[in-house]
Structure formats: structure tokens, C-alpha cells
Amino acid sequence: MKVVAIQPDVPIAEVERSLVHLEDLIGQAAREHSPDAIFLPESMTTKNVYDRRMREVARPIDGAPLQMLRRAARAHDCVVGGGFIAIRGNDARGTYAVVEPDGTALFHDKDQPSFWENNYYSAGTDDGVIDTSLGTIGIANGFEWGRTRTARRMLGRVRLLAGGMHFPSFPTWKATKPWFWDRDHFALVQYARETPPRMARLLGVPAVHPSHVGDFVMETMLVPGLAWPSLCVGESAICDADGVVLQRLGFDDGEGWVCADVDIDAEPRPRDPMPPGFWNSLLPISVHAVWHVGNVHGRVKYEGMKLLRRHRWQQ
């Protein structure tokens, strides 16, 4: 099966502009490769950052992002997947849609928002296993790629792992450069690069890992007025079931796409043992610190705004 992973560089919270651009990228990749499936990252409509403009990005589940995916799937006669913040009943979710050429759409809601994402949407409850015309696919959004519980709920049940990533790095502040940038940024890039093959080996199936790329400036949690200049690291990849990287795009490659043939007919055969912990690999202490602070801060703010009906999607 021929699959494409698209690595986009989209602006913050310019949903309609980004959708036009993404549809063009899908078209270019489809015309070049005639693939069976094309996958975009999670939160394809915006960089998934901490910024007041993010209050504007949630769209109805059947709104413009899904309609773009449907147009693309029909136009290019292939499965197309991409993520966006969707209004799902009384909540917003980090949703990933996989759309068939006939317009049928299947969804996965991210099981746990990461860091500041908790400000903008809440946790989903489905297992991320979907049955498509191509076979049974597992969908992982963002840091779901890094958690053992993602692999455990898909183990032996899927023939391909797809979905996508948004992997921002540390701020480039001069005062913290020796620690955050010169040391931990490098560790994060390595982690992002190793994540798709690691999950492929844990599940024993091929993996398609599209990811955001490009510079951005966001706000800083709990420090009003302090800008957080940084970047999304890229590291989009397509791997086989042994974790061999067939195609890859790093930060220096910028926006683009890669294509590879993967075998989804073979029975899943895990190559690596399942780690016992929450994460499937080690992360810097600084990431854990931002993780815990961001999770608590975001959940409290999300639920408080929901109670007061202050979210834009509640208006």
C-alpha cells in the first residue's frame, strides 16, 4: 500500500487560510504519487500552541475541516486523514478524521490533551482503532505516540499506525539557552525522530507519522506578556514494521511530503517488549515539568470557562 505523510508549516489560528493551503498540498502529493492514503498531522488547521487566538479555532465536527478532507478524498480517490479541534457535543476535542473516497468519515478523539492544549479541548474516550476500506488502522494524536497505553490498546488489533504529531520545542530565550536550547532541544529532536520507529516496533506494524514544522511565537503559560519563540521540529516519517525509516522529513527539510510503500497484509508481530511505564521512552525532566504544570493549568481553565460558558464554541 502506498502512503503519504504531509509535513505542513501553517500559521497560528488562521483556519480557513490553512485549509486552502492544505488542500493544495494534498493535491500536489496525490498527483505526484497516486497514493492509497494521505495523512496530515493532528491539529492540521493551526500550530497547536498556547495563544489567545487558539480560542477561535474549534470548528463543528462536520464543518470546514472535514469538508476539505472529503473533497480531497473524492478528488484523488484515496483515503485522507487529518486532525483539528472539533466541537463534539458539549465539549471540544482533539479530533482526527479519516475520510474514504465515498465521503465516509471515521473519527478518533485524543485521549488526553498535552501541556497547554488542555486550555482548548478535553479528553476523548475511544480506543483509536478504526476499520477502513484499507484495513484496520490505529490513530494516534500527538503524545499518544509516546504513551504505552496507546500501544497496549492497539496491540494485535491494527495493521497500520497513523495519525499525526505537533511537536513544539523549548523557547529560545537567551537566559535559558544553555539548558533549554543547547541541551534539551537536542534531546527533544532525537525523541521526535525515534518515536515513529519505536511505536512501529512495539506494535509490529508500519507507521505513518506526519508532523508540523516551522518557527512560531506563542504566549507563555502563567507569565502574561512573555513571548515564547520556538519551532515545531518536524520529523515526519514512514516506517516499516521493523521500525526501519523508509522516508523522513526533518526541520531543515521544511514543508513537504514523503511517500513510501508499506505492507499492511502481514499479521502484527511486535519486535520490542512493551515498556512498563507511562511513557514508552525517556523524556527530559524539563518536559515533565512543563507537562504537569500545563496539564493542571489548562484543565482548571478549560473547566472554569466551560462552567461560565466563556468558550467561543459555547456562544
Segments from the language model and where they lie:
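CN hydrolase (nitrilase-like) catalytic-core segments centered on the catalytic cysteine
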Residues: 61-81, 145-256
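Cys-nucleophile CN-hydrolase/nitrilase-fold catalytic domain and related Cys-dependent amidase chemistry
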Residues: 15-16, 20-101, 106-108, 168-205
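Short polar catalytic/cofactor-binding loops
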Residues: 7-13
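Active-site micro-motifs of SAM-dependent methyltransferase domains
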Residues: 10, 45-46, 147
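C-terminal beta-strand edge segments of enzyme domains
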Residues: 129, 206-315
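Active-site catalytic loop in hydrolytic enzyme cores
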Residues: 61, 87-194, 252, 273-276
